[in-house]
Amino acid sequence: MPLVNTTEMFRKAYAGGYAVGAFNVNNMEIVQGITEACGELKSPVILQVSAGARKYANHTYLTKLVEAAVIENPDIPIALHLDHGPSFELCKACVDGGFTSVMFDGSSKPYEENVAEARKVAEYAHKYNVTVEAELGQLAGIEDAVHVKEEDALFTDPGQVEDFVKRTGVDSLAIAIGTSHGAYKFKPGQKPQLRFDILEEVSKRLPGFPIVLHGASSVIPEFVKTINQYGGNMPDAIGIPEEMLKKAAKMAVCKINIDSDLRLAMTASVRKYLAENPAHFDPRQYLGPARTAIKD
C-alpha cells in the first residue's frame, strides 16, 4: 500500500468515534518503533515531520525512512504529514517532496491573513491529492520553532470555524481547547481541564468535519520518574489524562498529536541503559531499547 492522505482515515475515525494517532518523527528508531506497533495492531498511522525535524534530519532522509516503513508495513495506511508549516513555501516544498498531508499554521497571524494563506495552501495541495490541516486559536507551550507564552494562548472561537473552513477549503481543523505543547501542560496542583464545551460547539457548527488536537501527550508518569531517577530534572511534568483524550475522540476529534511522550520514552530508556551499563558505548546498545520503548 503506498502512502495515503488523511481523507479515508478521518472518515472512518469520525464514523467510529476514535482518533488516529499522529506521531512526530525525527530518526529511524522513532519511525520503526511507531510503525512496528501500528503494524501489529493493524492501525492506521500518521507520521508527521515538523519544520525543526526537517531541518535536523533533512527532508530526503526522513521521506526515505517513511518510504521504508511503508514497504515494511504494507497492510496499514500510513500518511506523511507536515506539522506546523509556518509558510506557503514550506507547505509547497513538502507537497512537491512527496508528503501526502500538510498543516499550514497561521494561528499567530491576523484572522484574514490566516484565511488567505490557508486557502492558498489548500488550492495548491489539492491539485496533488494532498490533504490540508489548518489551525484556529493558539496553544501555549514550546515545540521546535513554535513558542507561545501562556498569556498569549487563545482558545478557538467557535463563531469563526464555519467561515474559516468554507473560505479556505481545508480538510481538517486544529483547535485550542486547553492542551499545550511540551511536557508541562498544567501547573503543579492544577487539575487538568479541557474546554469540551468549545469542542462540542465546534462539532455542532461543523458536523462530520475532522477536528485535530495538538499538544495531546499524556506525559506518562513512569517515563518522567525514570528520567528523574537517572539524573534528569523534570519534577513538574504533567500531561493530558488518557480519559480526556478518549472523550475528545468521541466528539469529532479524528487526529491526536503525540510528540513529548515519544521524547520521554526514548530519554528514559537511554538514561536508564547508560546508567546501568556505563562501559557500553555502541549506540545500537542503547538505541535498540529506546526503539522498543517507543513501540511499547
Where are these regions (language model features)?
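Flexible, glycine/charged-enriched surface loops at secondary-structure junctions
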Residues: 78, 128-135, 279-288
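Gly/Ser/Thr-rich loops at beta-strand to alpha-helix junctions
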Residues: 217-219
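Alpha/beta enzyme core
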Residues: 4-12, 27-53, 59-75, 84-210, ...
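Generic N-terminal amphipathic, Lys/Arg-enriched alpha-helix
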Residues: 5-21, 280-285
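C-terminal alpha-helical cap/extension of soluble enzyme domains
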Residues: 229-232, 240-296
